[in-house]
């Protein structure tokens, strides 16, 4: 999972992610922005569910983050649909609306994001 942090001309940090992980970048850009307390909440949740059967989720304005002890899923809220809406044999996937990655990989991106934010 490759990523890049940039600042636009106004100083706002933007995250770009590799293919198949675009929704993670969108989550940072739309939900986190400068809200490092949200990252604290996610990191705490990751510690809480680690090694258990539990999961945790945080719905935002545009994206929802879901995690368990092994995996993080970020999906666009517009992807609300039930399994019955998908034809048999078909799967719905929009790479900019849904991303999955391991918890450890995700936490590495969070740490790198924090570090980049401190380089103002």
Swiss-Prot record:
Stretches of the chain forming a coiled coil according to its record: none
Signal peptide positions on this chain: none
Short name of one Pfam family: UPF0231
Similarity comment: family membership: Belongs to the UPF0231 family.
UniProt name for this protein: UPF0231 protein KPK_4613
Organism: Klebsiella pneumoniae (strain 342)
Organism phylogeny: Bacteria, Pseudomonadati, Pseudomonadota, Gammaproteobacteria, Enterobacterales
């Amino acid at each position: 999972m490759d990523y890049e942090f940039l600042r636009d001309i106004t100083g706002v940090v933007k995250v770009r992610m590799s293919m198949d992980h675009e929704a993670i970048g969108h989550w940072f850009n739309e939900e986190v922005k400068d809200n490092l307390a949200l990252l604290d909440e996610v990191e705490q949740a990751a510690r809480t569910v680690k090694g258990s059967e539990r999961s945790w989720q945080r719905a935002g304005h545009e994206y929802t983050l879901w995690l368990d002890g092994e995996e993080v899923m970020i999906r666009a809220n517009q992807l609300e649909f039930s399994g019955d809406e998908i034809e048999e044999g078909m799967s719905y996937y929009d790479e900019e609306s849904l991303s999955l990655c391991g918890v450890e990989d995700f936490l590495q991106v969070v740490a790198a994001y924090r570090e980049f934010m401190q380089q103002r």
